[in-house]
């Protein structure tokens, strides 16, 4: 029996994750498990569905039936484990597989010089930006397809998705050691370089476990107009590109749709689909 695909987005309550979840609801037909740190899951779900086509009462809304919200804090492993148990009950591995996983938590405290480095802020960036995605992989990578998995082609065709599954980590161009010409942002740069390393290692594991059925990549979305990057919009306009969030998530999904299994697995790609050097 073909394996039914599903999507995981963590987190989904604000910024890129929020708009990505809404975009996936409208442009795919797959069920989505999305996460929020909020304990008010109903309010979080209503916010994600607000204004979308078919917005009606939950019992009549086909988009609502495809979306499940769960509490998850990437700094608290028990909440990640609980979310994985929910995933297992919603999408039994014998009949389902995780086809798109977006592990995209992130925080940023800029440091222009070593004197501005604060131990607690630095550790928090590593905890959220690197350890968080690692723990997501620990508890959710088991749902990715194996070599013998036969994905449901009809579901993927309707959603315009490739047959291989994708695990995507959120990185940033500043995580490239090769392209570091300006310095600064010591902790954030190091954390994103760590994300790129994690993506490579996970992809090597998937290559053994899943073969051509799954790959892992890191992703640089560009400078996106969210609260996360608000104080840096000016420098982006000066030459590095500034994307509206709806445009950014559309490009993100298009990069996923166009991934080259042979040339791009384990690498970091930007919003144009170009490889960011390590």
How would you name each of these model-derived features?
Residues 9-23:
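N-terminal Rossmann NAD(P)H-binding glycine-rich loop of SDR-like oxidoreductase domains
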Residues 10, 95-108, 129, 169, ...:
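Rossmann-fold scaffold of SDR-type NAD(P)-dependent oxidoreductases
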Residues 28-44:
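Conserved glycine-rich Rossmann-like NAD(P)H-binding loop of the short-chain dehydrogenase/reductase
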Residues 51-78:
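Rossmann-fold cofactor-recognition segment
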Residues 72-96:
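Conserved Rossmann-fold cofactor-binding substructure of NAD(P)-dependent oxidoreductases
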Residues 106-108, 113-126, 131, 141-213:
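Catalytic loop of short-chain dehydrogenase/reductase
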Residues 178, 220-233:
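Short beta-loop-alpha junction of Rossmann-like oxidoreductase domains
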Residues 231-278:
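C-terminal helical subdomain
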């Amino acid at each position: 029996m073909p394996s039914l695909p599903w999507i995981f987005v963590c987190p989904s309550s604000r910024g890129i994750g929020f708009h990505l979840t809404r975009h996936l609801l409208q442009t795919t037909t797959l069920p989505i498990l999305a996460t929020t740190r909020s304990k008010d899951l109903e309010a979080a779900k209503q916010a994600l569905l607000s204004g979308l086509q078919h917005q009606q009462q939950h019992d009549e809304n086909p988009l609502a039936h495809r979306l499940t919200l769960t509490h998850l804090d990437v700094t608290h492993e028990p909440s990640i484990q609980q979310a994985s148990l929910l995933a297992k009950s919603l999408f039994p591995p014998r009949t389902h597989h995780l086809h798109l996983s977006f592990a995209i938590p992130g925080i940023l405290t800029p440091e222009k010089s070593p004197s501005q480095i604060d131990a607690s802020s630095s550790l928090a960036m590593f905890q959220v930006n690197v350890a968080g995605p690692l723990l997501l992989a620990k508890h959710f990578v088991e749902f990715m397809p194996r070599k013998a998995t036969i994905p449901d082609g009809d579901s993927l065709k309707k959603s315009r998705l490739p047959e291989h599954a994708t695990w995507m980590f959120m990185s940033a161009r500043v995580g490239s050691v090769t392209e570091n010409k300006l310095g600064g942002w010591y902790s954030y740069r190091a954390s994103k370089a760590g994300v790129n390393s994690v993506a490579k290692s996970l992809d090597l594991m998937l290559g053994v476990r899943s073969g051509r059925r799954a790959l892992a990549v890191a992703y640089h979305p560009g400078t996106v107009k969210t609260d996360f990057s608000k104080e840096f919009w000016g420098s982006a306009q000066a030459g590095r590109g500034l994307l509206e969030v709806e445009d950014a998530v559309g490009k993100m999904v298009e990069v996923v749709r166009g991934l080259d299994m042979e040339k791009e697995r384990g690498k970091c790609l930007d919003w144009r689909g170009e490889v960011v050097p390590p």
